[in-house]
Amino acid sequence: MTFHDNQMLILSFEALNTTVAEFRDVRDQLEDTFKKIDKDKLVRHNTDFYIGYIIGSIRANFVCLARQQDFSTNDINMALPYVSNYIVSNIAMIMEAIAST
């Protein structure tokens, strides 16, 4: 089984939705942790941290979803650059979805 563009787009969108839901669930826990280490303002304003966290989560969720649908490791590895391009080209929309939580 190999990736087709439509399958990859659907999996990417599912991975994005899963990531947004997970981010909403753990947001309060993250904020509590940041307050405990007394670097709340520094970490909240560190956009790179959040973007890296979100991109890493989308990629991880994509891999999990693809494995659940029995795609091979080779197929997944070949698709990841396209997933990264999808994420980068849609980062504004992704950040807006996260910010609206």
For each predicted feature, which ranges?
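Acidic, low-complexity, intrinsically disordered interaction modules
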Residues: 47-69
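Short, surface-exposed loop/turn segments at secondary-structure junctions
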Residues: 39-48, 69-78
